[in-house]
Amino acid sequence: MYPWLDRSGQLSWLKLSVFVGVTLPGLWAAVIWANGTPAAAGALGTSAMPVTAALHQIGLWAVRLLLITLAVTPLRRIGAWPRAITLRRMLGVSAFFYAAIHLALYVVQQNFRLGFVASEIVLRFYLSIGFVALVGLLVLAITSTDSAVRRLGGRKWQRLHYLVYPLTVLGLAHFFLQSKINVGEPILMSGFFIWLMLYRAAYHWNGDRGLSVVQLGLLAVGTAGLTLAGEALWYELATGIGGQRILAATFDFRHVRPAWWVMLVAAAFIPLKWAADRYWSRHRQAGGRAAAAA
């Protein structure tokens, strides 16, 4: 079945829109590669500059798509939008394909020296964990079909797909270690991941009641604080720049720190929650009036 069709085989404009959206970053990376200057790209367009730019863009989007996949659950619950669940499979499989293309571009960058690539994966820790994450995502992609759910059974399938959480951690660790000094983007992605995990923990703690607007606000602020602390700790331990300098720059908005972006995105779920509650409250009231009139 094509990814833009619903279960009845009909065109779904929502799924088609998401499919187009997940392909655009790949097309943009192809443009980056194709538009490398002859001097930089060489006769086949395979020298360091354009390939490396495409490699980094594709890897970044692999991580982003993993996080967007994990964001489907809070979007569905907070926004009271059950149809969002139909997008999760497409997003997750797209994350795998981006990760696989990321590896393929690394092979191209190394001039197709497969033996060298294999030795680098074994010897370099950040490449090793990235490869483990890719293999894990391959397993999840293969077992993402309806037939795989039937063969494994719902409970076993669900336990298997819980691996997405440690695999995302491995992907983020790979991102951190290859970024070295400039870890702004990995910090940002890690902050989003922290929020996604804390949201799940808080939701299960609350049970079927979900999270209130106040709880979502506290979660946004708390996640931003953890993101800032994590950034300061990274710079303190890994770079020698000093975490205090990061903390001191928190309110220097000439360069907005990742923690602020994390809080802004997390806080966006607050009006979504308010709007969803308001909509369903009106819907229930209208249903009650209709039942009373009948």
Language model regions located:
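Membrane-embedded alpha-helical bundles that constitute the cytochrome b-like, heme-associated redox core
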Residues: 1-294
